[in-house]
């Protein structure tokens, strides 16, 4: 894919991920890296994302949703490389299974989620995701299967 085409695709994906998907916008998700091997999302801790007011920790649903989004982004970037970055030809992507392991309380000023493709076949992709806080502590891991097509 040419640099100009890559930049245009990244701008489009950023716009879709950050502005057009209302829930992503509500969570404050920002794309930090379009690296196909390890895309990265970031969001800041805010009062409306707290799941336990007494302990002031991140809601588990925010963690799982963010891991799901970064998994989907990993697939989109992989498909972009295969399809020469033409979004119109992208197949539909849907989560068919998502597992999250909550390893530590979601404390931090901000959080980073990354995704890595474990296996991608003609119809199913398997992704491993991780979420770290601003101190670099691993707070959750996820594994997901997505239908592609």
PLM regions and their residue ranges:
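Residue-level preference for beta-strand/loop junctions
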Residues: 23, 37, 92-94, 109, ...
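Short structured motifs
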Residues: 25-31, 97-101, 113, 142
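Extreme N-terminal tail/first-helix region
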Residues: 1-21
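HotDog/MaoC-like acyl-thioester-processing domains
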Residues: 3-7, 76, 105-149
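Hydrophobic beta-strand-centered segment that forms part of the acyl-chain substrate-binding groove
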Residues: 74-112, 117
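Hot-dog-fold acyl-thioester-processing enzymes
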Residues: 49-74
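N-terminal structural module
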Residues: 14-39
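Catalytic strand-loop segment that frames the active site of acyl-thioester-processing enzymes
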Residues: 30-58
């Amino acid at each position: 894919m040419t640099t100009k085409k890559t930049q245009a695709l990244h701008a489009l994906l950023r716009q879709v991920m950050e502005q057009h998907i209302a829930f992503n916008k509500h969570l404050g998700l920002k794309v930090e890296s379009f690296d196909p091997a390890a895309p990265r999302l970031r969001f800041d801790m805010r009062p409306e994302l707290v799941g336990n007011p007494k302990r002031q920790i991140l809601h588990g649903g925010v963690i799982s949703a963010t891991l799901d989004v970064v998994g989907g982004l990993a697939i989109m970037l992989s498909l972009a490389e295969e399809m020469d970055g033409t979004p119109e030809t992208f197949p539909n992507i849907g989560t068919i299974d998502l597992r999250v392991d909550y390893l530590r309380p979601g404390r931090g000023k901000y959080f980073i989620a990354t995704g890595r493709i474990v296996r991608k076949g003609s119809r199913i992709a398997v992704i491993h995701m991780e979420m770290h806080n601003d101190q670099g502590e691993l707070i959750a891991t996820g594994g997901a299967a997505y239908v592609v097509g």
